[in-house]
From Swiss-Prot:
Keywords: Aminoacyl-tRNA synthetase, ATP-binding, Cytoplasm, Ligase, Nucleotide-binding, Protein biosynthesis. Residues 130-145 have a biased composition (Basic and acidic residues). It comes from the Bacteria. This is Glutamate--tRNA ligase. Monomer. It is found in: Cytoplasm. PROSITE patterns: AA_TRNA_LIGASE_I. The lineage of its organism: Bacteria, Pseudomonadati, Pseudomonadota, Betaproteobacteria, Burkholderiales.
Length: 478
């Protein structure tokens, strides 16, 4: 980013919406994190704006490229690619130091030599006096004030001269009007003794340089917002519009976090969830469009706005997520499902040549209404390409001696009939009539022997897709 702080446009023309997602790469990205990316991405798409990815990696000890890769992988899977970025804060240190020097020259910051021990003692006195712990301005230059002597060999921090008196007010798009008295805010450290800038300062410089118009983030950042607004205004810039999203709770009602058992977003991919189902579910986890529960990505982007963001914490419900996924599976084209299932079958040893026989889309069509994940659909599909082990309990219940002659007769009839659903159904009728049986008495054991369970879609459709040779071999195990 090359835009300087002094060159931002002040024209009256409507600004192009520019949003950002700014994760810290200190671990995997979970659903609570990714929802904080979903809404700014959706708002940028809905308004024809830009979505920027910024990696806030100033915590060098905890940040890793592996964590960045997981963030990028999760966003790519969900189809939330940024228009710009990723930008890395550690690569912008020269820019931050340039702005710090500018602020020092303007008297907006000052060096503070108070030691950690002195700060701890100050906090202890304030707490004993039942006061809010805060920096007391010992080193803040004021007219007529004598500062303490500068201690030898001590590198100072730089503190921002927070305004005295008045208040910080903003109209939050989720929380409404928020007002914080400046007297509640102490002078924030914006550079450490080694000169490295701190989070709240870097964020403001980035948001200005990247021309961010809307900051949509978790409400754990609310306390940072008045401090950031004051830095914006000290630099002569108006802050962006803020929308602070309520917390996402896990199923136990706790804040979703890695410590509380949250899973990486990519694990949901591995567990067989569709990206469009995840977007649908996450969208509803804090936003609504009337009573619509199931919608496409295109509908979401058409409908999304900031006015319908919820104010209450949303609770994750995996059973509901599976239901949403099941609805999307049913609505997904069979060819696409086949493309998604094929790699899962290949991972289980099914040769690519077998998968190219044209059956897989038809198998997906037959079973998708019974499945809530791609894993479940792949399990069904595997029956048609791999080996099958009948459920022992169902085998004992249905494959009884009394029905074995009928199974043998059906096997003979299927060996000779034309291979289509109608001919297979006719073979069943012929054997049932000859053996004096009803359909369930024969269909149930045939299902158990051929696909492993007594509960399947129409038996003639299943057998047609299984193929004559597999059926003959499996019926011989009766």
């Amino acid at each position: 980013m090359s835009q300087s702080l002094s060159s931002a446009s002040s024209s009256g023309a409507p600004q192009r919406v520019r949003t950002r997602f700014a994760p810290s790469p200190t671990g995997f990205i979970h659903l609570g994190n990714i929802r904080s990316a979903l809404y700014p991405w959706a708002f940028a798409r809905a308004t024809g704006g830009d979505f920027i990815l910024r990696i806030e990696d100033t915590d060098v000890e905890r940040s890793s490229q592996a964590a960045v890769d997981v963030i990028l992988e999760g966003m790519q899977w969900l189809g939330m690619e940024p228009d710009e970025g990723p930008f890395y804060q550690m690569q912008r240190m020269d820019r931050y130091k340039e702005v710090l020097a500018q602020m020092q020259a303007q008297g907006l910051v000052y060096p503070c030599y108070m030691s950690v021990a002195e700060l701890d003692a100050l906090r202890e006195r304030q707490m004993q006096a039942k006061q809010k712990p805060r920096y007391d301005g010992t080193w803040r230059p004021e007219e007529g004030k004598t500062l303490p002597p500068v201690p030898e060999g001590v590198q100072p921090v730089l503190r921002f001269r927070n305004p005295v008196g008045g208040s910080v007010v903003w109209e939050d798009k989720v929380k409404g009007r928020i007002e914080i008295q400046n007297d509640e805010l102490d002078d924030l450290v914006i550079a450490r003794p080694d000169g490295t800038p701190t989070y709240n300062f870097c964020v403001v410089v980035d948001d200005i340089d990247m021309a961010i118009t809307h900051v949509i983030r978790g409400d754990d950042h609310v306390n940072n917002t008045p401090r950031q607004i004051n830095i914006f205004r000290a630099l002569g810039k108006e802050p962006p519009v803020y929308a602070h999203l309520p917390t996402v709770l896990n199923e136990q009602g706790e804040k979703m976090s890695k410590r509380n058992g949250a899973k990486p977003v990519t694990q949901y991919r591995d567990e067989g969830y569709l990206p469009e189902a995840m977007v649908n579910y996450l969208a509803r986890l804090g936003w609504s469009h009337g009573d619509d529960e199931i919608f496409s990505r295109e509908q979401f982007l058409e409908w999304f706005d900031l006015d319908h963001l919820g104010r209450s914490a949303a609770q994750f419900d995996e059973a509901k997520l599976r239901w949403v996924n099941a609805q999307h599976l049913k609505a997904t084209a069979d060819e696409r499902l086949a493309e998604l299932v094929a790699p899962r079958l290949a991972a289980r040893g099914i040769a690519q040549s077998e998968l190219a026989d044209g059956r897989l889309p038809r198998i997906c069509a037959l079973f998708k209404d019974r499945c809530d994940t791609l894993v479940a659909l792949a399990d069904w599909a595997h029956v048609f390409y791999g080996e099958v082990t009948p459920n022992e309990e169902e085998r004992a219940k249905h494959v009884v001696d009394a029905v074995k002659p009928a199974i043998a007769a059906l096997s003979d009839a299927l060996a000779q009939c034309a291979w289509d659903k109608a001919s297979i159904a006719a073979a069943f009728k012929e054997v049932l009539a000859a053996q004096g049986l009803k359909m369930p008495q024969l269909a149930m054991p045939v299902r158990v022997l051929t696909v492993g369970t007594a509960h399947t879609p129409s038996v003639d459709a299943v057998l047609e897709l299984l193929g004559r040779e597999k059926i003959a071999a499996r019926l011989r195990t009766a």
